[in-house]
Amino acid sequence: QLDLRKYDLIMSSSHAFAKGILTSPDQLHISYVHTPMRYAWDQMYTYLKQSKLSKIGFEFPIRLMLYKLREWDFYSSQRLDYVISNSNFTSKRIKKYWGLESEVIHPPVDIKRFNYKNSRGNFYISLNRLVPNKRVDLLIKAFNKLNLPLIIIGDGPERLKLEKISNSNIKFLRKISDKEVEKYMSRCKAFVY
């Protein structure tokens, strides 16, 4: 437990637990929310289906735990003084699951980092964590069908599975520097998310 009693203003950046910090009535708590917990709300069954624990007989206790987590997520959100969301989509999720209004402030991007090149490469790019909820598998299926060149930058537990379903037009890059990301972003035909 963090001791935040000496601060008048608490700002949290949260997709799960940071917004749940306990504050006093004298403190103002502003939370920048990336999403209400997906695994406790609309994507619970997707996460359960993909969980190794549910495959070995733990689905019921996990489901019970996720329902309790959903309750906590809701009640902890009600203690926030002001909510900022990172997108219109997240704002709708906050309204739906927490019943709260939020102001949208998109994450900042220093666009000067990305030098536009007149000579574009003949490839598309995706920058992602390779996890189930990002649905990179759908992107791969589309690019397999279109046979267009795609570079996927990122890593995660789904990488090997995604590499197996990819045709030769799709290339994976892991752990590359920010400078290399900038180079690919400035040369690609389009960014795909």
Q: Where do the protein language model's features map onto the residues?
A:
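Nucleotide-activated donor-binding/catalytic signature segment of Leloir-type glycosyltransferases, i.e.
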Residues: L160-K183
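Active-site donor-binding segments of glycosyltransferases and PAPS-dependent sulfotransferases
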Residues: Q1-F17
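Active-site proximal beta-strand in glycosyltransferases
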Residues: L9-S12, T23-K55, I84, E103
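Conserved donor-binding/catalytic core segment of Leloir-type glycosyltransferases
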Residues: V109, N115-I151
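Membrane-proximal helix-turn-helix segments that form the acceptor-binding/catalytic region
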Residues: Q50-V83, S91
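An anion/phosphate-binding loop that grips the pyrophosphate of nucleotide cofactors and donors
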Residues: Y7, L80, C188
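Acidic donor-binding loop of glycosyltransferase active sites
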Residues: S186-Y193
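Acidic anion/phosphate-binding donor-loop and adjacent secondary structure
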Residues: K92, K96, E103-V104, P108-N122, ...
